[in-house]
């Protein structure tokens, strides 16, 4: 379901397969083109980790197809992958669920992330927060905001164009804009 959602919004999946494996580590996951590694603990037979699965799959567009040039622009990978979790939620559970999740992300970003990590820009961030909440939550917040201002038709057309113009390239935040 996530694969067809992402193909509809971002363009075709560019690899010949999607593989999954469970590995003996305790946190996080890691996508590689054609294969995604998840911690064994996420194989529960429930929907508990569905957004983690959707997040890692989305990296085939935001991270593998087009990737950030430097760690200081990690939001182009992780912020967009976090945005894709919300897009997956919307496709599966509807617009109201999407909007509630976006609202919670925005409030969390303002209430917790900014005081914890500081008021950082999305590009040229310190490497100490490359994988911080700021990159994920604020990055997704920016994508949601652009979607809201642009409307779905123009927003998703623009994202498809960005990805098509940057197939197998590294990009900076400046390139993105």
Predicted regions and their residues:
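Short, well-structured active-site flanking segments
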Residues: 14-16, 70, 74-78, 92-102, ...
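Juxtacatalytic substrate-recognition/specificity segment
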Residues: 1-73, 84, 125-130
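Active/binding-pocket-proximal capping segment
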Residues: 24, 75-82, 162-164
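An active-site-proximal "capping" alpha-helix that borders the catalytic cofactor pocket
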Residues: 2, 6-7, 77-89, 176-177
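Acidic/His/Gly-enriched intrinsically disordered linker/tail segments
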Residues: 78-141, 145, 149-150
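Sec-exported extracytoplasmic/periplasmic mature domains
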Residues: 7-11, 62-63, 85-93, 147-148, ...
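Secretory-pathway/luminal and periplasmic proteins that interact with or process carbohydrate-rich
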Residues: 27-32, 67, 88-95, 166-172
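Amphipathic alpha-helical substructures
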Residues: 132-177
């Amino acid at each position: 379901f996530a694969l067809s959602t992402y193909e509809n919004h971002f363009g075709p999946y560019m690899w010949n397969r999607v593989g999954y494996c469970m590995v003996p580590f305790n946190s996080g996951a890691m996508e590689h083109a054609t294969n995604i590694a998840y911690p064994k603990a996420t194989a529960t037979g429930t929907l508990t980790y569905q957004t983690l699965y959707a997040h890692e799959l989305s990296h085939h567009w935001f991270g593998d197809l087009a990737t950030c040039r430097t760690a200081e622009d990690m939001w182009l990978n992780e912020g967009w992958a976090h945005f894709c979790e919300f897009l997956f939620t919307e496709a599966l559970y509807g617009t109201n669920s999407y909007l509630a999740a976006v609202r919670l992300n925005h409030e969390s970003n303002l209430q917790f992330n900014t005081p914890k990590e500081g008021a950082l820009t999305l590009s040229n961030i310190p490497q100490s927060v490359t994988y911080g909440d700021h990159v994920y939550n604020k990055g997704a917040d920016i994508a949601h905001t652009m979607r809201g201002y642009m409307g779905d038709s123009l927003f998703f057309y623009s994202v498809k164009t960005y990805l098509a113009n940057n197939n197998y390239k590294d990009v900076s935040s400046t390139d993105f804009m």
